[in-house]
Curated annotation (Swiss-Prot):
One of its GO terms (cellular component) is nucleus. This is Protein HEADING DATE 3B. It comes from the Eukaryota. It comes from Oryza sativa subsp. japonica (Rice). Residues 71-87 have a biased composition (Low complexity). Expressed in mesophyll cells of young leaves, anthers, stigmas and the top of lemmas. Residues 1-12, 60-70 have a biased composition (Gly residues). A motif (Nuclear localization signal) lies at residues 349-355. Disruption phenotype: Late flowering phenotype under short day (SD) and long day (LD) conditions. The gene is HD3B. GO terms for biological process: flower development; positive regulation of long-day photoperiodism, flowering; positive regulation of short-day photoperiodism, flowering. The keyword Glycoprotein does not apply. It is found in: Nucleus. Involved in the regulation of flowering time under short day (SD) and long day (LD) conditions. Functions as a floral promoter by negatively regulating GHD7, a repressor of the photoperiodic control of flowering. Acts as a floral activator in the LD photoperiodic pathway. Involved in blue light-induced activation of EHD1 expression to promote flowering under SD conditions. Residues 108-120, 236-248 have a biased composition (Basic and acidic residues).
């Protein structure tokens, strides 16, 4: 059991070695005979409960004790009562319990914590009176070993060894006092020598106290304030040398000196940070209205006080964050010194320290504020929010607030919107998936051959087998021209040596019409004259030419949007064309193709003026033809009008074409190709270039034979393709690749949404 002592300063040596033994103070009846001693404890449990819980009975025996000239009997009575109270509750507690030291047991109520703080402040006030009275006599607290201070120091050592683990449980409320013994529970939270200021007793008021202060407590407070005013002058004079001695003794005795109420800030910070949920209103009820107290759990940094001041350190080299990082070294250097000085002197010194250390600590304050600002705001918000009863919103409460009609109306609107949103998300995901599949699988589109049906393949193969023999013709090079639509069938009479007769120029008109309506046409030879190959591939195999293949999207009324292969160095622009196939049988029309033009395709035979002549150089210079269309020229028949990109579709009878004048190409290898446009749906499909009327560029670079003889062609065979045409590249014309498929789907989705909005 710890040694107990009183707070009086009269008979110090007599009370120095007194040891308080038994549980009840009635054993010390001699003290009661001297006056002011505790009365005999009650004999029933209810009286015991009232004595230790009701504030009016708590200090009844020692209300006038603690004065400057208090007798040892008063000190003994106060010590005995404190001892009995602590022992009744089953633990050994020091006489002067640290004010506002949080207990490790988190189960206290707000009122009990507040009462504990009130009574601890009362004990601290009585203790301060004893110490201050000894200071006026010039006594050294460590050298004289006075009766009032020796048990106090032992009690403080006990507090240090236990690390502030004990907190009185027998108090209900607290009344703020002038001075408070504030001992830090956690040594890592505060540095030695922190200066703080307490508010006067007048400004302090208990917040939401369950009961009023007893008469004895009020009398004790009046005595405290009178004594403080009386000894204020002498205390200021004796404060400085005593403080120096205490600082020296702190290093030898391994105790930390705390100036006035310095440790209370650290304990309050840790207490609020750990127990903000248990005590959400502690900032109002459990803490005095101190001008330097930060609001709501500001731990680990210098916070701005309520009146604009700032907490300052007495030891400038030491920083609070450095102390927190070195808790072991600070544990051994702590010495508890009771607060000294009056209210006015404390405020003056605080202001002076504020001015001295403002420049030194400005950087630290700003840095620490930045580091802990978010955490502190969270602490404050937690404390303020959790003190309010949480709202439990249920559908019934909403119905009661807005009414049944509005509730069901809002519910239906929300459900409908969620349903629409679910459908939209499904459509968007489907669009993204389809776009990625289309963009990532061009080979599937080629192999599946979407442009040709099974029925069409059969008829095309028959047509090709009947026309395996073909006549080579001159075709423009890749640099200047590009393949376009040709007539879908090859006439039987196109042989190598002699031009056939007009009646052998091709198949029946029915077959031609069928091929024209199906939109299937053969691609032309884009090379100089070569001999025909009797082992030409059929239509199904001719999808892989040694050229670039472009998968062009074609919108068909029967098939919808399909990708059809198109061979050529450049994709068609503008209108959508029928499919193109390379490596087909070359087309060569005889010189007597007038009847063929009229009978087979129904093209009215135009006048044959200067453009129709014998094989040789043309009578007019070659006209440059745009690279997206190749003129097909017949030595004897006029070329049909070439449908260009500006005329995407011209409804015509089967095989009807507009006719233009002869269009020649200014190129190194003179050639001519007869070009026909046959539509699947009775339409003349257009090529992808602009009209040739806009591209007439006459050049007189010399006569070039546009109608060479067959023998000259056969005698001078040339490679059918240039060097850069030997490689085959499959290029798919798609809106976006697989990487941007989601963007395309998003645009489609937005267009769908806009259409729905317009419909609504």
């Amino acid at each position: 059991m710890a040694t107990r002592g009183g707070g009086g300063g009269g008979g110090g040596k007599e009370a120095k070695g007194k040891v308080m033994g038994p549980l009840f103070p009635r054993l010390h009846v001699n003290d009661a005979a001297k006056g002011g001693g505790p009365r005999a404890p009650p004999r029933n449990k209810m009286a015991l409960y009232e004595q230790f819980t009701v504030p009016s009975h708590r200090f009844s025996g020692g209300g006038g004790g603690g004065g400057v000239g208090g007798s040892p009997a008063h000190s003994t009575s106060a010590a005995s009562q404190s001892q009995s109270q602590s022992q009744v509750y089953g633990r050994d507690s020091s006489l002067f319990q640290p004010f506002n030291v949080p207990s490790n047991r988190p189960g206290h109520s707000t009122e009990k914590i507040n009462s504990d703080k009130i009574n601890k402040k009362i004990s601290g006030s009585r203790k301060e009176l004893g110490m201050l009275s000894s200071q006026t006599k010039g006594m050294d607290i460590y050298a004289s070993r006075s009766t009032a201070e020796a048990p106090q120091r032992r009690a403080e050592n006990t507090i240090k060894s236990s690390s502030g683990k004990r907190l009185a449980d027998d108090d209900e409320f607290m009344v703020p006092s002038v001075f408070n013994s504030r001992f830090p529970q956690y040594s890592t939270q505060e540095n030695a020598g922190v200066q703080d200021q307490s508010t006067p007793l007048v400004a302090a008021n208990p917040h939401k106290s369950p009961s009023t202060v007893s008469k004895s407590s009020t009398k004790c407070y009046n005595t405290v304030s009178k004594k403080l005013e009386r000894i204020h002058v002498s205390d200021v004079k004796s404060r400085t040398p005593l403080k120096d001695k205490e600082m020296e003794a702190a290093q030898t005795s391994k105790n930390v000196e705390v100036e006035k109420s310095s440790s209370f800030h650290a304990s309050k910070d840790m207490f609020e940070s750990r127990h903000a949920k248990v005590y959400p209103k502690m900032d109002k009820t459990g803490i005095i209205n101190d001008s330097d107290e930060p609001h709501g759990g500001n731990s680990g940094h210098q916070a701005t006080s309520r009146n604009g001041g700032s907490m300052k350190f007495q030891n400038p080299p030491m920083r609070r964050n450095e102390i927190s990082s070195n808790p072991s070294s600070e544990n051994t250097d702590r010495h508890y010194n009771l607060p000294q000085g009056g209210i006015e002197e404390t405020g003056t010194k605080r202001k002076r320290l504020l001015e001295q250390h403002d420049a030194e600590k400005s950087d630290d304050v700003s840095r620490l504020l930045e580091q802990h600002d978010a955490e502190n705001i969270d602490d404050v918000s937690d404390s303020s929010v959790e003190c309010i009863t949480g709202w439990e919103i249920s559908p019934d409460k909403i119905v009661g607030a807005i009414g049944t009609k509005h509730f069901w109306k809002a519910r239906r609107a929300i459900m409908n919107q969620q349903r629409v949103f679910a459908v939209q998300v499904f459509e968007l995901h489907k669009l993204v998936k389809v776009q990625k599949l289309i963009a990532a699988s061009p080979h599937v589109l080629i192999e599946s051959d979407p442009c040709l049906g099974n029925a069409l393949l059969g008829s095309k193969n028959k047509l090709v087998e009947e026309n395996l023999k073909a006549q080579p013709l001159l075709v423009a090079t890749i640099d200047d021209v590009e393949p376009s639509l040709q007539q879908p069938e090859v006439s039987k009479e196109n042989t190598e040596d002699s031009p056939p007769s007009p009646h052998d120029t091709g198949l029946g008109s029915g077959q031609r019409d069928q091929a024209a309506t199906n939109g299937v046409s053969k691609s032309n030879r884009r090379a100089t004259p070569v001999a025909s190959d009797n082992k030409q591939n059929n239509w199904g195999v001719q999808l892989q030419p040694p050229q670039n293949q472009w998968l062009v999207p074609v919108m068909s009324p029967l098939e919808g949007l399909v990708y059809k292969p198109y061979s050529g160095p450049c994709p068609p622009a503008g209108s959508i064309l029928a499919p193109f196939y390379a490596n087909c049988t070359p087309l060569s029309l005889p010189s007597t193709a007038g009847d063929f033009m009229n009978s087979a395709y129904g093209v009215p035979m135009p006048h044959q003026p200067q453009h129709m002549g014998a094989p040789g150089p043309p009578s007019m210079p070659m006209n440059y033809f745009p690279p997206f269309s190749i003129p097909v020229m017949n030595p004897t028949a006029p070329a049909p009008v070439v449908e260009q990109g500006r005329h995407p579709s011209m409804p015509q009878p089967y095989g009807n074409f507009e006719q233009q004048s002869w269009i020649s190409c200014n190129m190194s290898h003179p050639s001519g190709i007869w070009r026909f446009h046959a539509s699947r749906d009775s339409e003349a499909q257009a090529s992808s270039a602009s009209s040739p009327f806009d591209r007439f560029q006459c050049s007189g670079s010399g006569p070039v034979s546009a109608f060479p003889t067959v023998s000259a062609q056969n005698n001078q065979p040339q490679p059918s393709y240039s060097s850069r045409d030997n490689q085959t590249n499959v290029i798919k014309v798609v809106p976006h690749n697989s990487r941007t498929a989601s963007e395309s789907a998003a645009r489609i989705f937005r267009s769908i949404q806009m259409e729905r909005q317009r419909d609504d």
